Design a protein with these regions (language model features):
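N-terminal helix-turn-helix DNA-binding core of bacterial DNA-binding proteins
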Residues: 21-65, 89-96
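Conserved segment of winged-helix/HTH DNA-binding domains
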Residues: 90-117
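Alpha-helical residues within the helix-turn-helix
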Residues: 58, 69, 75-76
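Beta-hairpin "wing" of winged helix-turn-helix
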Residues: 75-85, 92
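N-terminal leader segment of winged-helix/HTH proteins
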Residues: 1-34
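Histidine-centered active-site/metal-ligand motif
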Residues: 6, 69-70, 97, 108
């Protein structure tokens, strides 16, 4: 329990279940990662289609090296997956609860409708 200097009538048992500061670090990393609008845009596109770097760079109006840099960060965070087909590498949003939650949050916050809905 955390002794509070002022008693405002809150249920103290709730504080007993409060996560430790380090428990929020992983969550904070996702928010930091998505603090870049280019990464949010790339992630959103990949939630709806599978693409190569060349096509993605045209779609998001960025250079291929810049898109590759952002993809590497998204992939390292587990938000994007890739597969190789011959010489081409295709990227898509990861099929994970976190990726789906972030996709839904982006669309809800921006009132964006998914293609095909």
């Amino acid at each position: 329990m955390y002794p509070l200097p002022h008693d405002h009538g809150q249920a103290m048992e709730q504080l007993a279940h409060m996560p430790k500061p380090e428990d929020f670090q992983a969550i904070s990393r996702y928010f930091t990662l998505l603090g870049d609008s280019s990464r949010v845009r790339i992630f959103w596109v990949l939630c709806h289609c599978q693409e190569c770097v060349t096509n993605l760079s045209v779609m998001v109006e960025m250079s291929a090296p810049a898109v590759s840099h952002h993809l590497r960060q998204l992939k390292n965070a587990g938000l994007v997956e890739s597969r190789r087909e011959g010489k081409e590498v295709y990227y898509t949003a990861a099929h994970t609860p976190v990726a789906q939650l972030l996709h839904d949050a982006i669309e809800e916050m921006e009132q964006i409708t998914c293609p095909g809905r």
